[in-house]
Structures are given as C-alpha cells and as structure tokens.
Design a protein with these regions (language model features):
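Walker A (P-loop) ATP-phosphate-binding motif of ABC ATPase nucleotide-binding domains
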Residues: 2
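Hydrophobic anchor at the beta1->P-loop junction of P-loop NTPases
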Residues: 5
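The conserved Walker
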Residues: 8-9
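Conserved glycine(s) of the Walker
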Residues: 12
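Conserved substrate/cofactor phosphate-moiety recognition/catalytic segment
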Residues: 15-18, 22-63
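Conserved nucleotide-binding/hydrolysis micro-motifs of P-loop NTPases
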Residues: 33-35, 85-86, 108-113
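Glycine-rich phosphate-binding loop used to anchor ATP phosphates in small-molecule kinases
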Residues: 55-107
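A glycine- and Lys/Arg-enriched "phosphate-lid" helix/loop adjacent to the NTP-binding pocket
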Residues: 99-143
Length: 143
C-alpha cells in the first residue's frame, strides 16, 4: 500500500508519518528531501526550495507520479509526505489504483494567521526547520 500524506505547511504531516512508522514499521520519505535533491543536485530542472508550494507541486509532479506508479507496481509499502501532492494532480493516481493507494490531506481550521505564525515560532524544533529564521510575512505566505 502506498500512503500519501499531504496538506498545508506546518500541519503535522511529518509528525504523523513518523508516528505511523513507529506503529507500523512502514517507512516514509518527505518530498522536501526529494525537492532538495533537485535544488542542489540538478538545479537546471528549475525545481528549488524558493518556489511557492503550488509551483513546486506542479513542477515536481511528473517525477513523483512516475515514482508512485513504480512503487505501486512493485507493491512497496511506503509513506510519502509533503505539500507537493495537490488534489487535482493525485486524483488520477488514486482513481487508477483505489486498492493500492491511500491519501490524506491535513490542515488547520481553528487558527487565525497571526496565531499560527506564533505557533510556528513557539513550537519549532530548529532541526531541519526551514521557516525558523524567516520573517513573519514569509511564514504567513507559506501557511
């Protein structure tokens, strides 16, 4: 089974993926790691970490789709998590493989923007946290 966990930035996708790993033993990978492979390994592809999340999703989708299709074909149990799975992009993959793909989208509805920025700053671990040193307006545009 291929599990895809997507949603807005800072909604807890990585936390859920890690907990799922601990409970099931099914490994996960963050699409952020794949995107940084493009950023630092093959910058000529134009996929980099300074694009807006929707731009990254559109540009990286052909690669992710091919990777997902191969994992499904090989019957690999795996979790992929990240913002780069937009509903309109993933629909075909899900429709073609309803018994082999599970998708969940995460977000937050009970928080206003100012509260969420405070939460981002207050609950940052600092480890791998790409928003920790960014100004409030940049954080607001990504959450």
């Amino acid at each position: 089974m291929l599990y895809i966990l997507s949603g807005t930035s800072r909604s807890g996708k990585t936390i859920v993926a890690k907990e799922f790993l601990n409970k099931t033993g099914i490994p996960y990978m963050s699409v952020d790691s794949i995107m940084m492979g493009f950023t630092n390994g093959i910058p000529e592809y134009g996929i980099h970490d300074r694009l807006w999340p929707n731009e990254i999703a559109e540009k990286i989708w052909p690669f992710l789709k091919a990777m997902c299709e191969n994992m499904i074909w090989q019957e690999v149990d795996f979790v992929l998590e990240g913002e780069a799975f937009l509903p309109h992009l993933i629909r075909e993959l899900l429709d073609n493989n309803p018994d082999k793909v599970q998708v969940a989208f995460m977000g937050y509805s009970d928080s206003n923007l100012e509260e969420k920025v405070k939460d981002v700053k207050a609950h940052s671990s600092g480890v791998g946290d790409w928003l920790i040193n960014e100004p409030n307006d940049y954080i607001e545009s990504h959450i």
